[in-house]
From Swiss-Prot:
Acts as an anion channel mediating the transport of chloride, bromide, iodide, nitrate, sulfate, gluconate, thiocyanate, oxalate and bicarbonate ions. Its permeability towards bicarbonate is weak and increases when pH is above 7. Mediates thiocyanate transport in retinal pigment epithelium cells. Mediates iodide transport in the thyroid gland, playing an important role in the synthesis of thyroid hormones and the maintenance of thyroid function. Residues 492-641 form the STAS domain. It is a multi-pass membrane protein. It is found in: Basolateral cell membrane; Recycling endosome membrane; Apical cell membrane; Lateral cell membrane. One of its GO terms (cellular component) is apical plasma membrane. GO terms for biological process: iodide transport. This is Anion exchange transporter. Its main location: membrane. Keywords: Anion exchange, Cell membrane, Endosome, Ion transport, Membrane, Transmembrane, Transmembrane helix, Transport. InterPro entries: SLC26A/SulP_dom, SLC26A/SulP_fam, STAS_dom, STAS_dom_sf. The chain crosses the membrane at residues 76-96, 147-167, 171-191, 203-223, 228-248, 255-275, 307-327, 344-364, 384-404, 405-425, 449-469. One of its GO terms (molecular function) is chloride:bicarbonate antiporter activity.
Length: 656
């Protein structure tokens, strides 16, 4: 190797592998979105609405954290931690300005399966009841949260792995009907899980296939064990919550700050329970002791990761899909963009980091996001401000929640799921717009109810792909290109006789194994139809119509016209501008079209081809030695045909 070449190679290598300062800054801003918006934060315009939204969000985070921790079969205090740490991590790495990450009903329900399976309730009598050094909780409670933290950790690892593999671009298969049906079904599961608290019943943990129906069967079998006091308090709480929230919605334009009815109800119910000693007098279940402070971080137990991999995948997929839908809705509403892959990273890190602080799996929630909308939040600063108030609850106010009745907490959760439950109204929309989507919605909801949210999500995605695969090969792949515009462009440069022997076909779809044969059939049918309009039927019937070339040669195979065929050579131009991607079968079919036409004295030219298509066809069909068949535009291809025709005329004159 010469010195000049070695120097040139080393310079190229140095240029390729030496990152520039601007590249590093851009990478940091792309992976840490907070660096992009925080320096431009407008204190004067945004701080007040973000503060108000943060206070209201903190109320939601605390109530949902307590309830979803119980839903996840762990001590309520861990729900407070799950409302704190994920929100901080997402504010740094996430792109959704109105996405409130924290505890989530669907992920809590999934993680509860692992907790109840590995540390069942009957183990409480087998483990030591002495308080541990962590938060003063029993060994049983700590074993349970370690399982939930392991689910959170492994779920986060899966999400980060999906970010590395750039699988965010594959989320297009999770359509709106699938998300709507899955979240509605999961919300129905959550409501069902709260029935025992609403009725004041003691009920064993029921899960698994058809567990939804077994729960209601158990309720009806033990209907006499319902506590009337809990039922009445639940009904009163639900009525108050629904009424006040509806009034807030009606008058939100006239009042600047809505009434925090959740907070008012918590204070009133706790005070009433304390004054009347409802826990002992009426046997109402209360939240109980809430430890103060945050424990030192500790790694989740790695030895049980293999045992929770099913729940971890469910948490990773369901949590991400639900959160992404909210982030995309926020971006669409407020006119900004998000990166689907970056959301994988943000939620993955939220789950991984939080698992070291005894947190249950996290995701964004519809109720909290809607709350940020209604209170006028501008940025993730609202979530960070809410974290300050959550810290106050953890260190100071937490013990006062001891007397909060569980039936009131369950009522708050049920009413908070209203946004998901009213998605039943989407059925009318899907029925009127696309009945196949209606069928996918109903079947996905049924599978979610009968099995679980992750099973319903998987079923919905499979149904969507099956519908696409079933309909894709039947979609029209080619069409005759409008010739009027083309004639106008070329009429000053060439005679119209050239265009009479040219057929321009537009490829409208990707060419893959699903539609390769359909492409060939469509191409032949269109050309036969065009030719049938310009020739007698008797001529067509005398031709072989099973091959592409006989279609292109105008069907004139009788003796009267056979002499004119060589002089009137036809050309086929394939406009590949709508040809977005291809596979081996697609390239094989294109080469087959070319070779078939070549053997029948028909020229096939391709316009608007990508470099990858040219390379693939050249390699597959060994076209290196062929005359030019690839052109940058349809006009260039027609000009090539016209030039060849003029050369042919000159050749004929010279022979004469």
């Amino acid at each position: 190797m010469t010195g000049a070449k070695r120097k040139k190679k080393s310079m190229l290598w140095s240029k390729m592998h030496t990152p520039q300062c601007e590249d590093i800054i851009q990478w940091c801003r792309r992976r840490l979105p907070i660096l992009d918006w925080a320096p431009h934060y407008n204190l004067k315009e945004n701080l007040l609405p973000d503060t108000v939204s943060g206070i209201m969000l903190a109320v939601q985070q605390v109530t949902q954290g307590l309830a979803f921790a119980v839903l996840s079969s762990v001590h309520p205090v861990f729900g407070l931690y799950g409302s704190l740490f994920p929100a901080i991590i997402y504010a740094i790495f996430g792109m959704g300005r109105h996405v409130a990450t924290g505890t989530f009903a669907l992920t809590s329900l999934i993680s509860a399966n692992a907790v109840e399976r590995i540390v069942p309730q009957n183990m409480q009598n087998l483990t030591t009841q002495s308080n541990t050094s962590v938060l003063g909780l029993s060994d049983f409670e700590m074993q349970r949260i370690r399982v939930a933290a392991a689910v959170s950790f492994l779920g986060g690892v899966i999400q980060v792995a999906m970010f590395v593999l750039q699988l965010g671009s594959a989320t297009f298969v999770v359509t709106e009907p699938v998300i709507s049906a899955m979240t509605t079904g999961a919300a129905t599961h959550v409501v069902t899980s709260q029935v025992k608290y609403l009725l004041g019943m003691k009920m064993p943990y029921i899960s698994g296939p058809l567990g939804f129906f077994y729960i209601y069967a158990y309720v009806f079998e033990n209907i006499k064990s319902v506590r009337l006091e809990a039922l009445l308090l639940s009904l009163l709480s639900i009525v108050v919550l629904v009424l006040v929230k509806e009034l807030n919605e009606q008058f939100k334009r006239k009042i600047k700050v809505v009434l925090p009815v959740d907070l008012v109800l918590i204070i009133a119910a706790s005070f009433a329970c304390y004054c009347t000693n409802m826990e002992n007098t009426y046997g109402l279940e209360v939240v109980g002791h809430i430890p103060q402070g945050i424990p030192s971080p500790r790694a989740p137990p790695m030895n049980i990761l293999s045992a929770v991999i099913t729940e971890a995948f469910g948490v990773a997929l369901v949590g991400y899909v639900a959160s992404l839908a909210l982030a995309q809705g926020s971006a669409k509403k407020f006119k900004y963009s998000i990166d689907d892959n970056q959301e994988f990273l943000a939620h993955g890190l939220s789950n991984i980091v939080s698992s070291f602080f005894f947190c249950i799996p996290s995701a964004a929630a519809m109720g909290r996001t809607a709350g940020l909308y209604s209170t006028g939040a501008k940025t993730q600063v609202a979530c960070l401000i809410s974290c300050i108030f959550i810290l106050i609850v953890i260190y100071a106010i937490g013990p006062l929640l001891y007397w909060l009745p569980m039936c009131v907490l369950a009522s708050i959760i049920v009413v908070g799921l209203k946004g998901m439950l009213i998605q039943f109204r989407d059925l009318k929309k899907y029925w009127n717009v696309h009945k196949i989507d209606w069928g996918i919605w109903v079947s996905t909801y049924v599978f979610t109810i009968c099995f679980a949210a992750n099973v319903g999500l998987l079923f919905g995605v499979v149904c969507t792909i099956a519908v696409v695969i079933g309909r894709f090969p039947r979609t029209m792949t080619v069409s005759i290109k409008n010739m009027k515009e083309m004639e106008f462009k070329v009429k000053t440069e060439m005679d119209s006789e050239t265009l009479q022997q040219v057929k321009i076909i537009s490829i409208n779809n990707p060419l893959v194994f699903l539609n390769a044969k359909k492409f060939y059939t469509d191409l032949m049918n269109i050309i036969q139809k065009e030719n049938a309009c310009n020739q007698p039927l008797d001529d067509i019937s005398k031709c072989e119509q099973n091959t592409l070339l006989n279609s292109l040669s105008n069907g004139n195979c009788n003796e009267e016209t056979s002499q004119s065929c060589p002089n009137e050579k036809c050309s086929l131009i394939l406009d590949c501008s709508g040809f977005t991607f291809f596979d081996y079968s697609g390239v094989s079919m294109l080469v087959e079209v070319y070779m078939d036409s070549k053997g029948r004295s028909v020229d096939v030219l391709l316009a608007h081809c990508t470099a990858s298509l040219i390379k693939a066809m050249t390699y597959y069909g060994n076209l290196d030695s062929e005359k030019p068949i690839f052109f940058e535009s349809v006009s260039a291809a027609i000009s090539h045909i016209h030039s060849n025709k003029n050369l042919s005329k000159l050749s004929d004159h010279s022979e004469v």
